Amino acid sequence: NKQYYQNHLVAHSMGILMLGLVTDDDELVQFAIDSPANPRDVKELLSGCILMDGDTPCSREKAGSAPPVKGEIYDRYRHDTGPLKGLQYTHLTLTLLSTTARMCYNNGLDLFAYTAPTGENLRYCFEYYSDFYRSMDSCIKSGYYCGETERMTKAGDNPGMYEMGLRYYPDSEPIRQLINSGTFNRESSYM
């Protein structure tokens, strides 16, 4: 229970969920999604990976960093430890969480509509980070990710993933603005 709320844990839970779905093992699916026996199940990861205003940032972030705001992802600390890989890793975590949510959606559980007891929802992440990929500027908002612009979209953090965000949040203006911005080729972009 000491592992950070980051992409490794999300990939692990996604793998457990996938195995449960493929083998039709309802107990394994429940263990992956919401189980007292699994302290890092999908619902716990949604509340732990998605940051909200006032949340305590990872202890590995530099002192004096901009505080996290609603929709940022815990993996943002990779900006300091990567270094300059905060957007890359937050995109990876959002992709893994969204793929997990999509698997659940396809099996009758809508995690795109799920809001954790402490307020976290995937929509906030799509909306927060969409502005970075629309503007292709890592220095916007708090400036926390400043210095990462040159790396954006070069390490698997493709803005095409936001098509999934638009599918589940069609009324989201920030996501729609990214998709319609012409920043990326919708026909050749992939998740």
Residue ranges and their predicted role:
Residues 113-191:
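CBM-like carbohydrate-recognition segments
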Residues 1-109:
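Aromatic-lined, polymer-binding surfaces characteristic
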